[in-house]
Amino acid sequence: MKLSRRSFMKANAVAAAAAAAGLSVPGVARAVVGQQEAIKWDKAPCRFCGTGCGVLVGTQQGRVVACQGDPDAPVNRGLNCIKGYFLPKIMYGKDRLTQPLLRMKNGKYDKEGEFTPITWDQAFDVMEEKFKTALKEKGPESIGMFGSGQWTIWEGYAASKLFKAGFRSNNIDPNARHCMASAVVGFMRTFGMDEPMGCYDDIEQADAFVLWGSNMAEMHPILWSRITNRRLSNQNVTVAVLSTYQHRSFELADNGIIFTPQSDLVILNYIANYIIQNNAINQDFFSKHVNLRKGATDIGYGLRPTHPLEKAAKNPGSDASEPMSFEDYKAFVAEYTLEKTAEMTGVPKDQLEQLAQLYADPNKKVISYWTMGFNQHTRGVWANNLVYNLHLLTGKISQPGCGPFSLTGQPSACGTAREVGTFAHRLPADMVVTNEKHRDICEKKWNIPSGTIPAKIGLHAVAQDRALKDGKLNVYWTMCTNNMQAGPNINEERMPGWRDPRNFIIVSDPYPTVSALAADLILPTAMWVEKEGAYGNAERRTQFWRQQVQAPGEAKSDLWQLVQFSRRFKTEEVWPEELLAKKPELRGKTLYEVLYATPEVSKFPLSELAEDQLNDESHELGFYLQKGLFEEYAWFGRGHGHDLAPFDDYHKARGLRWPVVNGKETQWRYSEGNDPYVKAGEGYKFYGKPDGKAVIFALPFEPAAEAPDEEYDLWLSTGRVLEHWHTGSMTRRVPELHRAFPEAVLFIHPLDAKARDLRRGDKVKVVSRRGEVISIVETRGRNRPPQGLVYMPFFDAAQLVNKLTLDATDPLSKETDFKKCAVKLEKV
C-alpha cells in the first residue's frame, strides 16, 4: 500500500483517535499502525550541542526514519529543539561521501590533482608512506592531528593513545580548544579539577539566573525552556542577561545588559567590590574554604612571538600567581567603583546595582551560566576565574540551586576532549603530559616503555596552523571537525599551510566540507548511530548508544580508521632503540597489537553483544572493542574523583553523572552529603587542591587585542543561530533547516546602516585587516547589535566570516577570541 504524506498523517490521527476511544480501526489506519510497528526504536543522545538531550531513534529497513524526544530522558523530558527533530536527515544529504578520495594526476597522488575515488587500502598506503617519511626525516613533532568534541569517548581515547603513546607526538588537539579551553583552565586554576560542580537540576531550585555571554534561547534551547518555565511560574525568580548585543534571550530578561566588548571583566570585579562593601561575604564559608591569590598581568594575546602586541607584553603567557591578603584583595577590587564601571562598560548604574544585588543577597540562590562570550575571549580564563570569585565570596556554590555553570557547545567536549584528555597537554582524568608521575601512570597502564609519552606539550589548534604554514608540521589528520571554516584567520594562517606542497592533509568527514575540499585525502566517515558511541555532556552525564544502522558505502567510523591504520606501524618504526630495550617483548609488534588488541582491551568477547546488535568494528576484530577501550580508560578516574560506572550500566540508564560511586551518581560536587569524596564534618572540600580550598583570583581589566579605530570602525562578533549548528555541515543538508535560515546575514544597527547608505537586504562587503567577505545587511530580526558593533554567524560556507577574524587567543588556554575584531563596511 502506498500512502501520501497527507494520507499517512490523516490515517495516523484516525488510528490514534480510534485507539483512544476504544473503537475499531479503519483499514488504512490499520496499515499505518502496522508500518509504525515495523519501526524499531532505541535511545541515543542528540548529535548536536552539549546539552545532552535524550532522543528515541526510529529505524526501518536499515535507515533512520524518525526521531522524537525521549520522555524518560532527565535532561529534556521528551522535548527536542528544532534541530533535534530533524536528526534523521543529517545522515542522508545528497552529497554524502561513501568512498575515499585522493587528489590524483596521471594515476598517482598530486597536490594539485583532482579528487579521485580509491580504496581504503590505497588510502592507507598513501597515509603510511607520508607518516613514515615525516617520522623518519623530522621526527614525531612533524605529524599532528586535529580532533573533536564530537568524537565518541572511545574514538578520542583511541586517537590519544595512537598519537601520544604510539607515534610519541603530543601534537593532537580537539576543536574544543576553540570553545572550552578557557573553561578548563579556569576550573583547574580555581578548583584544581575540571567541569561544573552543579547540574541541570539546579534550574528548578534557583531564584536567579545570570547569563554571561550566552544566548541560551538559541544555543541551549531545551535548558532555556526549563529556565523559562521556572521564571514564568514564579514571580520571585529573576533573569539577568549580559551580552555585547541584544538577542533572543533578552526576551525573558528582567535585567538585560549590553556592555562594551571586553568590559565584562570590569563588571565582574565591580560585583566583587559591591559584595565586600555591603558586607555580603559568607564569612564562615570564606574563612574555611577559600584562598586568595594575585595573578600575573600584561600576559599578551597568544599571537605569534613576532607580533608587536607580544613583544610589548611584560609577562607573555604567564599563569603565575602569588598569595595575597584579604585587605589587599579588598583594595584591588575597590578600584572598580560603580561610577568607573558604568563609564567603562556603557551600562547604566541602576542595571549594574540590580545585578550586583542578586549575588549579594544571602537569600537568593543564583546560577551563573556562560558559554562562548566568556570562553572565546583573550582573557577568557580570567573571566571564568572572576565569576567563580562571586560564588566563592558568597558561598553560593555546590548546593542545589546555586553555582557557576560553564555550558558546553559540543556533545562530548566534556566527555571526550576534556575527560579523555585529547588536548595537546592533557592525559585522562585531568592528568597532564608535563607531570612525570602522570606520564608514568599512563605508561604502566598501557604497558609501554617508560619515557614513551613526550613531556613536551604539543601544538595547540592555532599553533598547528602556524606550524603547517611554517613547514614544521607536515602530515596532518583532522577528524569530525571543519576547521577550515570554523577556525580563525583563514587567509593568513590556515589555508597557506594546508595547500603548501610540503604538507599532506587528511580529512575524515561524512561530507565534502570546506576543510575536506582543501585537503589532499578525504576519508568517508560513519555518523552518529551508524556506530556505537558514548558522549559526556555539560553536567558530567555520560550517555551511551548502540549502533542502529550501517554507514553507506565504504564509510567507516573514526574508531575503525584509527585502529586499522595502527596496523601499518611496527614499534621499531616509531620508537627509538632505547625504548624498545626497556620492553623487548614489544619488538616486532604493530601499534594495533600494542595499543588496541591488548589483553586488557580485547578481553570482552563478542558474546557480550546482543545477538542482533550491530557493531561493525567489534565484529570485524573479534572482540568488544568499545567496551575494552572504555573500561581501560575508566580505570584512570576511579578512586580519583572522576569515577565512571561500569560499561554495561550506561546501556541500561539515560546517562549517569560522575563521580559514580557504589552505583550512585553525583549531582553536586564538593559538598558534604552530596559528594562521596567529601567526608562527614568537612562541609565543603575542593579536593582538586592539595589543601581542599578553592582560589579567589585578583585579575584586572585588560583591553582586547584589536579594537575599532578610524578606518576599521566597527566591532565584529561571530557566533551561531538556532537553526544551524557550527559550520552547518549537517544542518544545511536538512532542507527544512536550510530554508529557515538559508544564508548568513550581517546584523547591524539601523543607524550604522543608514550612516553607510545601506538598507536591509543590500549586499555589503565586510573587510578586516586580514580579509573580506560579501554578506547581506539585516537591520531587523532576532539579533539587535548596538551602534558600533555588527554580528555575523559562521554557518555559511559561502560567507567565510573567519577570513576576517584575528587569531588572537587567551595566552593561558590558547582559545581563540572570535567575539572581537575590527571591521569596516563597503557597499557593493
Curated annotation (Swiss-Prot):
Which compartments does it reside in?
Periplasm
Which enzyme class?
oxidoreductase
The UniProt entry, under InterPro entries, shows: Asp_de-COase-like_dom_sf (IPR009010), CT_Nitrate-R-NapA-like (IPR041957), MoPterin_dinucl-bd_dom (IPR006657), Mopterin_OxRdtase (IPR006656), Mopterin_OxRdtase_4Fe-4S_dom (IPR006963), MopterinOxRdtase_cofactor_BS (IPR027467), Periplasm_NO3_reductase_lsu (IPR010051), Prok_molybdopt-oxidoreductase (IPR050123)
Subunit structure of this chain's protein: Component of the periplasmic nitrate reductase NapAB complex composed of NapA and NapB.
Keyword Oxidoreductase belongs to the record:
yes
Q: What is its EC number?
A: 1.9.6.1
Q: How is it modified after translation?
A: Predicted to be exported by the Tat system. The position of the signal peptide cleavage has not been experimentally proven.
Q: Check the record and name the Pfam families matching this protein.
A: Molybdop_Fe4S4, Molybdopterin, Molydop_binding
What name is this protein filed under? Periplasmic nitrate reductase
Where is it predominantly found?
periplasm
Note how many cofactor molecules are bound and how.
Binds 1 [4Fe-4S] cluster.
Required cofactor(s) = [4Fe-4S] cluster; Mo-bis(molybdopterin guanine dinucleotide)
Write out the GO MF terms: 4 iron, 4 sulfur cluster binding; electron transfer activity; iron ion binding; molybdenum ion binding; molybdopterin cofactor binding; nitrate reductase (cytochrome) activity
Q: What does this protein do?
A: Catalytic subunit of the periplasmic nitrate reductase complex NapAB. Receives electrons from NapB and catalyzes the reduction of nitrate to nitrite.
Species of the source? Escherichia coli O127:H6 (strain E2348/69 / EPEC)
Catalysed reaction per UniProt?
2 Fe(II)-[cytochrome] + nitrate + 2 H(+) = 2 Fe(III)-[cytochrome] + nitrite + H2O
Q: Identify the residues that bind substrate.
A: 794
